[in-house]
Regions:
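Bacterial Sec signal peptide processing site at the extreme N-terminus
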Residues: 17-33
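Conserved beta-strand positions in repeat-built beta-propeller and related beta-rich domains
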Residues: 87-91, 131-136
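Repeated scaffold domains used in trafficking and secretory/extracellular systems
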Residues: 69-78, 115-127
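Structural signal for beta-propeller blades
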Residues: 94-95, 138-139
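Sec-dependent bacterial lipoprotein signal peptides
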Residues: 1-20
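Short loop/turn segments that connect beta-strands within beta-propeller blades
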Residues: 99-103, 143-146
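Beta-strand-rich domains and repeat architectures in extracellular enzymes and scaffolds
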Residues: 36, 60-86
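Beta-propeller fold detector
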Residues: 46-64, 106-115, 148
Length: 148
């Protein structure tokens, strides 16, 4: 009986340690520069450098309320160190911050930057922030929104 209890305890310890999750920390997901992506006729952008494709028609509709506003446009995307994606385009008033969830980009934050729409936004890494430059205006963003 005593041997049975010892064996059961050993198996329990082994079972518990085998079920613990593995977490790799100090990971940096940041892209060094933004991707400027042409939108195809179906509303998709493909970034071969980072191996993803996404349909952005819903994003352009959210921004403009026009289902064809993506035509002949480019989307600007960059990823920060935590793995959040920042997306905007010329004419957008907002920057959209997404996280990946179950195979989809899920909106985390929508940040209003220019009531009239940005002319030529450009994004860069400025750790721990993403910097957005639009003409003379510069903004620092993180996954929670605009740095105050």
């Amino acid at each position: 009986m005593k041997q049975f209890k010892i064996a059961a305890a050993v198996l329990l310890v082994i079972g518990i340690s085998a079920c613990s999750s593995l977490k790799l920390t100090q990971t940096d997901f940041a892209w060094p520069v933004e991707s400027v992506l042409k939108i195809d006729g179906k509303g998709n952008v493909t970034d071969n450098r980072f191996s993803y494709t996404v349909n952005v028609k819903p994003l352009f509709f959210e921004e403009t309320q026009d289902s064809l506003s993506y035509t002949s446009k480019e989307l600007r995307m960059i990823r920060d160190a935590k793995g959040y994606y920042y997306a905007t385009a010329a004419g957008f008033k907002n920057v959209y911050i997404f996280q990946v969830n179950d195979g989809a980009f899920t909106l985390s934050e929508k940040v209003m930057l220019d009531e009239k729409g940005m002319n030529a936004p450009v994004m860069n890494q400025r750790p721990p922030y993403v910097e957005l430059i639009n003409g003379a205006n510069k903004y620092l963003l993180n996954n929670e929104g605009l740095k105050k």
